[in-house]
Design a protein with these regions (language model features):
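N-terminal targeting leaders of exported, membrane, and organelle-targeted proteins
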Residues: 12-16, 33, 45-47
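Cell wall/extracellular polymer interaction/catalysis modules
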Residues: 48-201, 209-249
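N-terminal secretory signal peptides that target proteins for export/translocation
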Residues: 1-28
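Bacterial N-terminal signal peptides
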Residues: 27, 31-43
Length: 249
């Protein structure tokens, strides 16, 4: 039932999950009109359910970041990309590197698999990254939605290839060799001494101890979403918002 019907019949929202779901549906319906409203309404229930689920599994994550990540993921899936994805990792780069700012969720099993530290690029900033880039050689973090590919063993050990799907944000990820890998500088002890984690050349590097299980959980067709300044538009599935260049599209 819609919000007006619920108000007229005196129904109440009993749980946090219900309140989040209804708030999200209401906010999304105000963004679209006409034919777009009909199409969006058909997809809203499942999308709102996933937003509510993630909010329950990862209560420390901000709701707007969850909405953004799920919206970007659903946009990609509506274009036939990652339609079989079961797992989603969300990184919030507005949070200091000294804090855990990466969540890996199994949407199929409805479980939080990891809540972890993650590094940003050395040219992006100190503790909280301020600069982001899609340029080769920038050594800055790229934001937006990524589709995971195969694993390989490289100079940083066991690593995961990433396709950048967000036009203007991360489409050069493969050319930049932006991958997920473990790194000894991703260590809370380092952060305590230096006031920040060690930094990468733009890769979302994680702790060595959890790199392999995290990579194995995310490899081959799942999603990673990196939130930061200016990414709010990525939840809106507009024409040209998705780049499939690195996928051969």
């Amino acid at each position: 039932e819609n919000l007006n019907t619920m108000k007229q019949t005196g129904m109440t929202v009993a749980t946090k999950s219900d309140r989040i779901l209804l708030s999200y549906v209401s906010s999304m319906l105000t963004r679209v009109t006409g034919v777009l409203a009909v199409a969006a309404a058909l997809a809203l229930p499942a999308q709102a359910d996933e937003v509510a689920l993630i909010s329950q599994l990862a209560p420390s994550m901000r709701l707007n970041v969850i909405e953004e990540a799920v919206g970007a993921m659903k946009c990609a899936q509506s274009r036939g990309v990652g339609v079989n994805a079961q797992r989603l990792a969300i990184i919030d780069y507005t949070i200091p590197s000294r804090q855990k700012r990466m969540w890996v969720l199994d949407l199929e099993a409805e479980k939080l698999l990891f809540e972890e530290h993650v590094a940003h690029g050395k040219k992006s900033g100190h503790d909280i990254p301020k600069l982001f880039s899609n340029r080769v050689g920038s050594h800055q973090t790229s934001l937006g939605l990524f589709l995971t590919d195969a694993t390989y063993h490289g100079s940083n050990g066991y690593s995961l290839k990433l396709h950048g799907l967000s036009k203007g944000f991360n489409g050069a990820a493969m050319r930049r060799l932006i991958v997920m890998h473990g790194a000894p500088y991703v260590d809370p002890g380092v952060a305590a001494r230096a006031g920040r984690l060690g930094r990468s050349w733009g890769c979302p590097a994680v702790r060595v101890d959890i790199a392999r299980p995290m990579i194995d959980a995310l490899k081959e067709g799942n999603f990673i979403y990196s939130h930061g300044p200016g990414t709010s538009s990525l939840s809106q599935c507009g024409a040209g918002s998705l780049t499939l260049a690195s996928l051969g599209g």
